[in-house]
Amino acid sequence: MDYFRLAEKFLREMHAKYMKRVSRPGNTPRPWFDFSEERLLSRLFEEMDELREAVEKEDWENLRDELLDVANFCMYLWGKLSVKNIYDKGEEQ
């Protein structure tokens, strides 16, 4: 499997995890818009702690799941910072 196919599979898994999370009542479909940088960082660190626990327990199935959570929160924070940068420069979306 080449890099592109691996990245595509990972992105599909991230999206499935995202959809599972945002379909719950009360969850926002756009955390990169609706949450502050501080809240996104806090949630990212929580997910990293859960990832660390999965590694320590050698729980490989849960480790895969936690990697998706960390990746999603990295993307949400990246999106927040990117959108903020666009607005700070006065550019359109």
UniProtKB/Swiss-Prot annotation:
Disulphide connectivity of cysteines: none
Keywords assigned: Coiled coil
Gene3D superfamilies the UniProt entry points to: MazG-like
Domain of life: Archaea
InterPro entries: AF0060_NTP-PPase_MazG-like, MazG-like_dom
Pfam families per UniProt: MazG
SUPFAM superfamilies with a match to the protein in the record: all-alpha NTP pyrophosphatases (SSF101386)
Organism: Archaeoglobus fulgidus (strain ATCC 49558 / DSM 4304 / JCM 9628 / NBRC 100126 / VC-16)
Record's protein name: Uncharacterized protein AF_0060
Coiled-coil regions listed in the entry: 36-69
Signal sequence, start to end: none
